[in-house]
A protein has these predicted regions:
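A glycine-rich dinucleotide-binding beta-alpha-beta segment and adjacent secondary-structure elements
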Residues: 183-191, 413-432, 441
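C-terminal structured "cap/appendage" subdomains that terminate the fold
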Residues: 445-464
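Generic long, charged, amphipathic alpha-helical segments
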Residues: 244-246, 424-449
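Short small-residue beta-strand/loop micro-motif enriched in glycine and branched aliphatics
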Residues: 211-215, 377-382, 442-446
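Short, conserved aromatic-histidine micro-motifs
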Residues: 239-241, 479, 483-484
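Short, surface-exposed secondary-structure junctions/capping segments
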Residues: 77-85, 384-390, 449, 454, ...
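Structural alpha/beta core scaffold segments of enzyme domains
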Residues: 1-373, 429, 463-464, 468-471, ...
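N-terminal amphipathic, basic-rich helices that act as targeting or association modules
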Residues: 134, 141, 347, 352-415, ...
C-alpha cells in the first residue's frame, strides 16, 4: 500500500527501452521480489514522556522518534512528529526525530506514513497513565482534545475540527459499555492525519444533451470517481447519472499529484467545483444575452438559469439541457478548466474501540468487537467512506497482531511470501462497526476531509491497550504475535 506513489523501478524500463530503440518494456516482479525490494514502511523505536495531573489534564509531552529509512533515507519521521501530539492541547511539547540509515530496502509510503507508529507510542502511554490513576480513557481525551482555535503541537492553529464530537460519539456507543469476561479487555485510542491538497488540474465540459463530462488526473483507487460525480452533480443541481467522470492519461491534462495523502476527493473535488462554476457563469452570461439583461441579474439554481428576482424581468427558467442544445448558436462549446495548488489540510481525527480476548495458554489474540468513529467532514458517498474506515482498521489490526518483516542473521528477508507474511483474512476479524461524524471542513466547498488514511493510526494502540487490559501486561513492541503475548504473560514483560 503506497508503493505506487514513488518512482522505483521505472528508470530501468526507460533505459531498456532506449537501448532497444524505443520498444515498449514490461518489467515483471515476483511476489518475493516485491516484498524484498519495493519497500515496507519504516521500522521505529520511540521514547515518549507525558505529564498528566491527577485529575487527567495533560501538562507536557516529549517524543524522540528513530525511524529506519533503509539504505537511502527518507523515513516518515517528520510526519510522525506532526501526528504525535496533534490530538491534544498541551501547554508544552518537544519533538526530536532521526532518519536512520540501514542496509535494508528503502522505506516506502504506507497509509498515513508515520502516524500509526506515533499513535502507538503516545496513545499507549496515555492509556497506561489513565490505568494508574483510575481515570476513564475517553474522559481524559475529552478534557485535552484540541478544538477550533487551538494551536496544534506542530504549529498551525486548527480551524473547525471534530475530535470532541468523535470522542463523544465513541463514548455513547454501546460497545463502550458491553460487559467483558475473564481474559478479555477493551482498548481505546485516537489518531490523526492531515490530508493535504496539492497540485491538481481538472476539466469540465457540457455535452449537447445537457450531461456533464469531468476529466480528472487522480486515479480512482478508493471511490473518488463516484464522489467527484456527486460533487459535480450537486454544483450544477442535476442528477448524479448526468455526470461522467473520466481519468485522464498523464499527457492529456495539466499536472496532477498522485492519488496519495487522502487528497483525491479533497483536492479534485475542490478543483471540480471551481471549473464547474466557470461553466455555470458562462451559461448565465449566454442566458442574459438571450434575455437582454445584465449577467448579474441571472442566477443558477437546481440545474436552471433563473432571473434574480422580479426586477430582472418576467422570464421562465432555462434548463441546462436547453442551454446545451443551443450551444452552437450562442457561442460554441461550454467548458471549464481549473488548475490549483491547493494549500491547507483537512485535519481528520478518528477514535477506535477494540475488544479482545487473549488465550492465556497460547497467547492468541482474538478481536471480539471493533468500532471506528471518524470525522469525515462531509461524507459525500457514505458507503465508500465506511469502506475506507474499515479498510484502515483491518490494515491496522494486521500490523498490530501479525504483520512483520523477519530478517535473518545474514540480513536477508526470511518471509518474502504471503504464506509467511500473514495478513488478516475475514475469519480473523469481527464486523467492523462504523460511525461517520460530520464536522464540515471550512476550507472545502463541500466540507470534505480526506478519509483514506486516518483509520490505520488508532488500531495499533487500541489493540495494545486492549491486550494490556486483558493480561495486565503492557506490550511495547509490535506485532503482538501469540508467541510474544505468551512470553509477556509468563514473564510480565515483552522485553522492551
Amino acid at each position: 500500500f503506497g508503493g505506487k506513489t514513488t518512482i522505483f523501478i521505472e528508470p530501468l524500463a526507460l533505459a531498456l527501452s532506449k537501448k532497444s530503440g524505443g520498444r515498449p518494456v514490461k518489467i515483471v516482479m515476483s511476489r518475493a521480489e516485491v516484498l524484498r525490494a519495493t519497500g515496507p514502511t519504516a521500522s521505529a523505536s520511540m521514547d515518549v514522556k507525558i505529564g498528566m495531573t491527577k485529575d487527567g489534564y495533560l501538562t507536557s509531552g516529549s517524543v524522540e522518534f528513530r525511524m529506519q529509512g533503509g539504505a537511502f533515507g527518507g523515513s516518515p519521521v517528520s510526519e510522525a512528529l506532526q501526528c504525535a501530539f496533534a490530538s491534544y492541547n498541551m501547554p508544552a511539547v518537544h519533538h526530536i526525530g532521526y532518519d536512520i540509515l540501514a542496509n535494508r530496502p528503502r522505506a516506502a509510503a504506507y497509509r498515513a506514513p508515520g502516524s500509526p507508529m506515533a499513535a502507538f507510542a503516545v496513545e499507549s502511554l496515555i492509556d497506561e497513565i489513565c490505568t494508574d490513576l483510575s481515570l476513564d480513557p475517553i474522559d481524559v481525551r475529552l478534557k485535552n482534545a484540541v478544538k477550533e482555535g487551538d494551536k496544534s503541537s506542530y504549529g498551525p492553529k486548527f480551524k473547525k475540527i471534530g475530535l470532541i464530537e468523535t470522542l463523544e460519539a465513541t463514548k455513547n456507543h454501546p460497545n463502550y459499555s458491553v460487559s467483558l469476561e475473564v481474559n478479555q479487555g477493551r482498548g481505546v485510542a485516537a489518531g490523526y492525519w492531515m490530508n493535504h491538497g496539492g497540485e491538481t488540474s481538472v476539466s469540465v465540459s457540457l455535452a449537447e444533451d445537457g450531461s456533464v463530462n469531468v476529466t480528472v488526473g487522480t486515479p480512482d483507487i478508493g471511490g473518488s470517481r463516484a464522489s467527484i460525480a456527486l460533487m459535480t452533480a450537486e454544483t450544477y443541481g442535476i442528477p448524479y447519472d448526468s455526470v461522467s467522470v473520466n481519468i485522464a492519461e498523464t499527457g492529456a491534462l495539466g499536472f496532477n499529484e498522485p492519488t496519495h495523502g487522502s487528497r483525491a476527493t479533497l483536492a479534485s473535488g475542490k478543483a471540480v467545483y471551481e471549473a464547474a462554476n466557470q461553466t455555470i457563469s458562462e451559461m448565465c452570461r449566454r442566458v442574459a444575452r438571450k434575455w437582454q439583461i445584465d449577467p448579474d441579474a441571472v442566477f443558477w439554481e437546481d440545474g436552471y438559469a433563473k432571473p434574480a428576482g422580479p426586477n430582472a424581468g418576467d422570464f421562465s427558467p432555462i434548463s441546462i439541457k436547453q442551454i446545451a442544445s443551443e450551444m452552437d448558436k450562442t457561442g460554441g462549446p461550454i467548458a471549464g478548466h481549473h488548475e490549483a495548488s491547493i494549500r491547507g489540510v483537512g485535519h481528520s481525527f478518528g477514535v477506535h474501540i477494540a475488544d479482545v480476548e487473549v488465550d492465556p495458554e497460547t497467547g492468541r489474540v482474538t478481536v471480539l468487537r471493533y468500532l471506528v468513529v471518524q470525522d469525515a467532514g462531509r461524507a459525500i458517498h457514505p458507503s465508500y467512506v465506511e469502506g475506507q474506515f474499515q479498510g484502515g482498521a483491518v490494515q491496522g489490526i494486521g500490523w498490530a497482531l501479525n504483520e512483520e518483516y523477519v530478517y535473518g542473521a545474514d540480513g536477508c528477508l526470511q518471509n518474502a511470501a504471503f504464506l509467511d507474511y500473514r495478513i488478516p483474512v475475514a475469519s480473523d476479524l469481527p464486523n467492523i462497526d462504523t460511525i461517520i461524524v460530520e464536522v464540515p471542513n471550512p476550507d472545502h466547498p463541500f466540507g470534505v476531509r480526506g478519509v483514506g488514511e486516518t483509520g490505520i493510526a488508532p488500531p495499533l494502540p487500541a489493540l495494545a491497550n486492549a491486550v494490556a487490559a486483558a493480561t495486565k501486561v503492557r506490550l511495547r513492541s509490535l506485532p503482538m504475535s501469540p508467541a510474544k503475548v505468551l512470553k509477556a504473560i509468563k514473564t510480565g514483560s515483552d522485553g522492551c
